[in-house]
Amino acid sequence: LLQMFSFCPCSSHADTDRFTWDLRQEDMDLDDLSRQLQDARDSLQPLSSSPVLRYLQGRPEEAESILSQSEEKIRECYGEKSDLRLIVMYGDLAWLKYHRGDYTQSQNYYKRVQDFQHPTGSPAVLHPEVYGEKAWTFLKFSVSYHHKAIDCFCRALELQPDASEWNKGYTIALYRTEPDSPATKQLSRALDLDPDDGFLLALLALKLAAHHKHQEAKSLVERALLLSPDDPQVICHVGRYLRQQGQLDRSIDLLQRVLRRSSRSHFIHHQLALCYRKKKLNLFTRRQSTVAQRGLD
């Protein structure tokens, strides 16, 4: 019993649970994060990130409940590769059980982490799935963590250079932090590995349009709409592209349609507001031009 109470997962496997990754509440907007996770509810990312959000919101019981329900969904998604995908989840449960006083279960989960934690036997090397999970968490939780996300995706790619998931994550992180060529180059690589990813297609279209490659950008946008017509994240970026190209009515129609499915999406509301603002400015400019022309007449 004494040995059980002296065990503390926060010091023994800090690289494999989110609660020890220095995710500070002051660095993030919890309400906005909650909306983002709701928008992405069809993917596994909310499943992995929601427990930390619930804990930061002062709801540890919900955090533990979500984690306890996660294993089956992860196994359904990843099949025989799910053990490596479960390392961080088991680490989260070990930490949470310990801090809620369930030392026996905490140690059981910690032992599961130990079974898979280091692929080479070296404590300096983790599985790419752990680096990837850490990177996605940093990318999702706060803009101030995006450079940490880049570092973690790079570590995952060192071990699995052709993994489409790590290339996609690295692409998104670069897109949000690098202004020009590095992100564009990585977007192209990620799409070579996963050519049917509507989100990446929309991101690359925005980059190409910024470099005046309008025909190629337009083609990518239409393909993104064909592949992901109801994905709020894809439509948000497509709507942004259309607004920048002056297609305000089409942008508004798409954004309003997807808004009916994700009514709390901050990003879609923001893009709609920008569209209406631009329409108002266009109307004002036309009126000013008409008044000026009448003055000349």
Outline where the language-model segments fall:
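Non-TPR docking regions that flank or precede TPR/alpha-solenoid scaffolds in eukaryotic proteins
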Residues: 1-297
